[in-house]
Amino acid sequence: MQKQEKIIEMFNQIAPTYDKANRILSFGVDVSWRKKACKRVLELCEENTLNIVDVACGTGDMIEIWQESVQKAHKNIKHIRGIDPSSQMLKEARKKFKNVEFIEAGAQDLPLESESVDILSISYGIRNVVERQRALGEFARVLKKGGILLVLEFAKRERGGFIAFFRDFYLKNILPSLGGFISKNKEAYAYLPNSIEEFLSKEEFSTELQSVGFKNVDFKSFSFGVSSMFIARKNDR
C-alpha cells in the first residue's frame, strides 16, 4: 500500500470518533483558530456572493464555520463544497450537513473547473498530502484570478523555550495515548507529531505557494506558534 493510501485508510478508521477526539485533544481551541482565519479571509475578499471549496474537509468542521462566518460578514454563499479522499470522513460529514455537496477526491486531482472558485481552504490537511506541490498547483488552477487560498496547519517548532518544551511533550507523549484511547487507534495519533515535524518551515511553505502562482502570502501564528495560518491570493494575470 502506498503512503497516501495508508494515510487515507488511517482517517477512514478514526472517522467515527474524529470530532470528539479533535475537541478534546485541542481543548476546543481549534474552533477559535478556524473562526479567526475565516474572518480574516472574508475581510480580504471583495466578492459578496461566494463559491467556496474546503479541501480535506473531514467531517465538515470548516463547512460549518464558513457558513457562520459568511453570514456574519453580510455576504452570501452561492455554492459550498467539501472534498476529501476518505469515504468514512465524508459519511460522517453527510450526517451533519444535508444541503452541502461532498466529493470524494484527493487534493492533488480536484474534479473542479478551472478558475471557478472564490475561496479555497484546507485546514490541518496539507501535511497529509504526499504530492503537495501538485495539490498546490491544483488549488491555483481552480481558483479564480485574485481568488484566495487559506491554509491552516500545525506549525513545525522553530525555537526553544518552555512553551516549545510543553508543546513537544504534549504532542509526543500525551496526544498519542489520549487520542488512541478515544479512537482505539493509537497509531493514527502517533502519526500526528511525526507529520508535523516532517512538514516545511513557514518560509519554505511560503516559497512553495509563490512557485505555483500565489502572491501576497500573509502569515499568522496562533497559541504561541502551535497553529499557523497562511493566506495567499492567486496571481491575477
Per-range role (PLM):
Residues 1-19, 182:
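N-terminal, positively charged/glycine-rich alpha-helical extensions of SAM-dependent methyltransferases
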Residues 6, 85, 152-208, 212, ...:
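C-terminal alpha-helical "lid/dimerization" subdomain adjacent to the S-adenosyl-L-methionine
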Residues 28-49, 65, 69:
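Conserved alpha-helix/loop element of class I SAM-dependent methyltransferases that forms part
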Residues 51-109:
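Class I SAM-dependent methyltransferase SAM/SAH-binding core
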Residues 108-119:
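A short acidic, Gly/Pro-enriched loop at the edge of an enzyme's catalytic core
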Residues 121, 150:
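A conserved beta-strand element that flanks and buttresses the S-adenosyl-L-methionine
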Residues 133-148:
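A short glycine-rich, Lys/Arg-flanked "PGG" loop and its adjoining helix->strand segment in the class I
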Residues 206, 212-237:
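Core SAM-dependent methyltransferase catalytic element
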